[in-house]
Amino acid sequence: MRKDICAIYAPFHPLTPKYSYKGIFMLLILHPNIQESDPAFKKTMSHLQQLSGVKIKQHEVSGQLQSLREIYLLGDTHALDIEEIESLPAVEKVIRISEEYRILGRHKTQGGRSGFHYQGLAFDQESLHIFAGLCAVDNPKHVEEMLRALQANGLNCTRMGAYKPRTNPYAFQGHGKDCLPWVFDLAGKYGIKVIAMEVTHESHMHEIDKALADAGRPCGVIMQIGTRNTQNFELLKAIGKQSEYPALLKRGFGITLNESLNAAEYLASEGNSQVIFCLRGMKSEFGAPHRNMVDFAQVPTVKRLTRMPVCIDPSHSVGSRDIAPDGVLELCHATAQGVLAGANMVLVDFHPAPTKALVDGPQALTLNELEPFLKDMEIARKAYLERVTVWQDA
């Protein structure tokens, strides 16, 4: 079975109204690297187009080693013979799908490693990437200091907020497109491969794409959808309709986990299955004194229900630099809990001068704390892998 993305079509759900076909869907996984011009593909499509009451939709994802193509049979597929469909020359495997999260979900008959590659990096449920950086871009000096520190510590990913939706209309809203040219130039200078950057409007995607093109595309961008926009369906559709940039979707702070996962499915149903799901805490008085109720215990839950890489955002979950009696920051304890549970990405705020930060300075770690933070997470990651080995051998 191939070791790459295997996309499965969208569920019939209030959040995904685009394809409201009822019944059990059928997924056809085609042989790797097959093209539309291949005789086997043409013969397969000719047969499928003769099926009654079935809609056909194709989806293609380019991995690092393989081009992956899948066909979805939508509608009443109960009467279709799996063995007959599987005998078609372009088909490698056939799967019936009836569960929720049909594109991003984890399905019983589906094997192999899933995920995607972007900018030469693997994003899946086995990897771990640290995205340390500025919650909000403030000035070139601080951005360069941050990126220099990342390079010195062997990191090639970061977070940089150019567009900042704020609860207070008078608070700093970010520099927007004006800062993109020098942010991307500095990213190229310091070997940054991927930047996680929040967008709040479709126009922001176009501004980012233009700025990257003007800079010679020195890095890539993951389009981050913040917790306030988890159910901004027009934004989800816009990001889902393009496949140039992966998406990172934060859990909605006032909705259920199921609703947030279906928002991710909304992205994938539009065609972009390169989605990372981010746990960032839930808005609740029971989380006090933390900023939000830390929800990193649900890292394995999301991995069980879906095939998405799972990110954690300890900065916006904990929201402070409070130190526990053992001398470790509570934020670092929370981060380690998520990594110990198998998190695949950490989105964490750092700043060269937190007291001068324009957004969320009180929760930002300092550059002097970057090295011990990374060592701490390395310990947690090794412990997670050892835990997995213990249970696999049990």
List each model region and its residues.
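N-terminal small/glycine-rich loop or linker at the start of catalytic domains
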Residues: 116-135, 166, 304-320
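N-terminal active-site wall of soluble small-molecule enzyme domains
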Residues: 165-220, 232-234
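Catalytic alpha/beta core domains of metabolic enzymes, predominantly
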Residues: 231-350
